[in-house]
Design a protein with these regions (language model features):
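Basic, flexible Lys/Arg- and Gly-enriched helix-loop patches that mediate nucleic-acid binding at interfaces
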Residues: 1-242
Length: 242
C-alpha cells in the first residue's frame, strides 16, 4: 500500500491545515506505532497513529477537487426550481458523481467559480471560517459610489442582526449608470455582497466569483464547464488555510 505523508493524514482527519498539522507533529504529540512521529514521515492504514493518546483514523481516498464555472440561472441544489436548472446537471460524469459535495455555493443569479469534491473533510476545511479562505468577485452595480460608502463597506454594516463587511473593494471606471467593482470578502453568507451593496443604495446587476483562496477561475473555462484540479492545487488549498 502506498504510504501518505503524516500531516496529510491528520489534515484529512480534520485536525487542521497541512501547516497546522506539521506544527502538531513537531510538538511531539503524535505517535506512530508507539513512537513519537517525526515531521516528514509517511504512514499507511496498517500503522497505528495517535494524537494525544487518541487513535487517528486513516482516511484512504483519492481526493478529487473540481472547479465549475457556474452560469447565472442555475441553482446550487440537487432539486430544480421552476425553470432553473440544478448545478448537478453540469457535473462531470464520474463514478458516484451525485455524491460530490458543493463548496462555495452561489445564489441563482450569480455566476463563476464553485468547487466540488468527493472528500468531506476537504469541503469542511475549505468552508470553515477560521481557515480564512478569501473570495474575489467582479460586481457590476448601478448607483453613486464614494469614499464614505467604501468606508462603510469595509468597516461593516449591520444587516439582519449580522455585521457584514468586505475585506477589500476597488472601483473601476464608470460606464453610463453602471460601474464594475473588484470585491473581496472572507465569509460566504447567503447574498452577502448584494445585501452590502443594496444597503448603500447600489443595485447589483452582475456578480461573478473569479477566485476562491489560491485558486482562480481558469482562463478559457466556459460557463457550465468544469476542470479537475491537480494534486499541486490541492496542496495549495491545504497550505492556504490559516
Amino acid at each position: 500500500m502506498k504510504k501518505t505523508r503524516l500531516q496529510k493524514v491528520l489534515a484529512r482527519a480534520g485536525f487542521g491545515s497541512r501547516r497546522g498539522c506539521e506544527e502538531i507533529i513537531s510538538s511531539g504529540k503524535v505517535t506512530v506505532n508507539g513512537e513519537i512521529a517525526k515531521l516528514g514521515c509517511s504512514v499507511d492504514a496498517d500503522d497505528e497513529i495517535k494524537l494525544g493518546g487518541k487513535t487517528v483514523e486513516f482516511v484512504d481516498i483519492q481526493t478529487r477537487l473540481f472547479v465549475l464555472n457556474k452560469p447565472a440561472g442555475v441553482i446550487c441544489s440537487k432539486k430544480t426550481e421552476g425553470n432553473l436548472k440544478s448545478i448537478y446537471d453540469l457535473l462531470p460524469k464520474i463514478d458516484n458523481e451525485k455524491n460530490l459535495i458543493i463548496v462555495g455555493r452561489l445564489d441563482a443569479n450569480s455566476s463563476g467559480l464553485i468547487f466540488f469534491t468527493n472528500d468531506g473533510k476537504l469541503s469542511e476545511f475549505i468552508a470553515h471560517p477560521s481557515n480564512l479562505f478569501d473570495r474575489e468577485y467582479l460586481v457590476r452595480a448601478r448607483g453613486n459610489f464614494n469614499d464614505e460608502i467604501k468606508e462603510n463597506m469595509l468597516t461593516g454594516i449591520k444587516i439582519d442582526s449580522q455585521l457584514l463587511r468586505l475585506s477589500d473593494i476597488i472601483a473601476g471606471d464608470k460606464t453610463s449608470s453602471n460601474r464594475w467593482y473588484t470585491v473581496c470578502l472572507l465569509t460566504g453568507r447567503n447574498r452577502e455582497i448584494r445585501k452590502i451593496f443594496e444597503s448603500q443604495g447600489l443595485q447589483v446587476s452582475r456578480l461573478k466569483r473569479v477566485r476562491f483562496g489560491p485558486i482562480f477561475l481558469p482562463k478559457g473555462l466556459k460557463e457550465g464547464g468544469w476542470a479537475e484540479l491537480k494534486s499541486k492545487d490541492l496542496e495549495k488549498m491545504y497550505s492556504y488555510g490559516k
